[in-house]
Amino acid sequence: MANYDLLVIVINYNSKSFVGIVKKLMEGIAELTRYLNTKLLFVDNASSDGSFEEAAEHARKAGADVEAVKLTKNFGFTRAVNIAWHYARKKWSFKYLALLNNDLVIIPRNLAKLAKYLEIGRVAGVQGTIMQMHNPSLIDNCGFMIDQNGLTYPVCRGYPFDCAELYTPSYLSGACSLYRADAIAELGQPFDNRVESYYDDKHLGLRLWSKGYRLLHVPIIVAYHLGSASYSCNGRTIKGSKWFEGIVFAELAIAVNYRRFSYPIMALYIASSVLASILTMNNYVKSYIIAVKRVKNFIDETIAIRNIPKIVYIKSIAKFNRLYKGIQIKINYK
């Protein structure tokens, strides 16, 4: 039985309309192997648009250690994850489990840093700060909080990165989170098969808390998330200047992060922005310029907290703001 540090599970279903993002994810997972011995289990829910084959082949070419499995029918997201979990447990030994949506671009080095926090006491799950792909300077979420009425709130959604704090959320984002494999094994499997999608991550988080485990958000940017792309209508075309800005930002940010900055890539996006502006009458050139400017601040943002000291005790005080922007968290350390 092969041994791995990290098992990454990615579920795919008819992602042709955003397959470029899926490919970038595959490249990011391949980069993860520089920091953690990583196995990718890429599972498809019986797609009919060829996206699975295209993305799986791209993952292999990128150098990922990937096993691609196509299911006989669409089992839904949560059941597909559970199938993948049991499949992996029979074939490999792994210490950590990463659950990643297929509509995000990851920062591999930062994602790998999260693993060390799973060695702190009873911490069983951890996530970093997830940014919005359409508005890359704004947070998608820093985990989620549940209030006394059972309502859930995405922490810091719609706020800039300086909103992000080290704290213990009620549950982690299903889009990008890491767990201790032994903690998941104690639950039997990640999700409840009765929940097809959405709030599966909430249920998982509460189950871990009920077992005496803790969850943690670490304020370091780990991914840019498109959001709900897997559940969009078939044939949906993702376009628009804001979307283009997010794609350019993610591409250039990764290049800068790995000191692989390429002027041909810049030239390609410049040409694409000009052509797209002419064809769609949207200002893609402006979006390109904004993306390039934001890349200049990227390094400072991603290393905002490099060396967080060992956590002895964290007390979270949630200040609830029931607006679409989510909530901010105020932390007291003792």
Regions flagged by a language model, labelled:
Residues 93-105:
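Short beta-strand-to-loop acidic/aromatic patch adjacent to the donor-nucleotide binding site
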Residues 147-169:
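Short, flexible, basic/aromatic active-site loop/helix in glycosyltransferases
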